[in-house]
Structures are given as C-alpha cells and as structure tokens.
C-alpha cells in the first residue's frame, strides 16, 4: 500500500493495485515480501507511531498490528513524550512536520533522555531532501523513511533497527 502526502492537503491511497500485486505473489508463491522469520521477530515489539495525520497513524497501526506488533499512536511530540514514558516502546516512528513540537525537537528530547536514548527513532517525512535527512541524523535519528512508504519499506526499517 502506498500513501501519498502533500503538504497542506489530504492524503490519498493507492492501495488496491499494491494489495492485489502482493496477494498474487503470496498465492502464486513468488516471494512473499516479508519472510516468516521477519514476521516472528516483529511479534511483541512495542512501536510508537507519532504523526499528526490520522490516516498515517491508522495505516501504520493496521500494518504493524498484523505483524504482531503492539502499536501506540500519538498526534504530536508532546503526546509522544507522555506515551513514551507510559509504554516504553522498542522503536519510534516520528513525523517531521507536526504542530506544537515537531519531529526534530521530539527526537532530540528522546535522545537526550538517559532512559530512552538507546530507543531507535525513525523519521517520517514527505520531504526527501539531503538537508532533512542530515538534520534528522544530527538530532539522533537512526533512519529516515520517506512518505509515501510501502509495507515492505515500513517493515524493512523496523528489521534494520532490531536486528
């Protein structure tokens, strides 16, 4: 499934074709994108998804829940900080452009906390510029995922951080 994000506009799905293509691979037996071992290794992981878009939060929650992850969501950086303290996630996805406390500030606060500094943070953004990626690294993020992202990209990003 792909999600297109346009700054200041609504999100739109292009999921039917991707879903049909993936289903065809599984039925024909031509390379299920996520191996059984990868799915098992994701089972039980606590993941926090921080994004001001309800569509992105729901989509990530649905995809990750199907893989056995325990998913928590937050609408902005302030909400995320309280959820991090309450749930102690194994991995955090943070959107860059959010109201009140943006993704860079949120990541920086997480990485400056003695308890949570080792928690992997993956930045999410519809912007794919070198400056944005560099700024994410400066504040401590481990990886940068550009929207729209596929299920494979989302799960691959998690696998890169937990393995």
Which ranges hold each PLM region?
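C-terminal output helix
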Residues: 15, 149-158
């Amino acid at each position: 499934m792909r999600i297109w994000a346009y700054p200041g506009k609504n999100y739109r799905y292009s999921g039917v074709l991707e879903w049909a293509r993936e289903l065809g691979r599984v039925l024909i037996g031509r390379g299920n994108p996520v191996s059984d071992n990868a799915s098992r290794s994701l089972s039980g992981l606590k993941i926090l998804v921080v994004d001001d878009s309800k569509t992105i939060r729901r989509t990530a929650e649905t995809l990750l829940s199907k893989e056995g992850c325990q998913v928590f969501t937050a609408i902005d950086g302030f909400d995320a900080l309280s959820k991090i303290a309450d749930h102690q996630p194994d991995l955090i996805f943070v959107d860059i452009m959010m109201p009140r406390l943006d993704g860079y500030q949120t990541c920086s606060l997480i990485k400056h906390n003695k308890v949570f500094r080792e928690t992997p943070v993956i930045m999410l953004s519809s912007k794919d510029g070198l400056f944005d990626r560099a700024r994410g690294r400066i504040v401590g993020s481990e990886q940068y995922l550009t929207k729209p992202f596929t299920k494979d990209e989302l799960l691959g990003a998690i696998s890169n951080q937990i393995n």
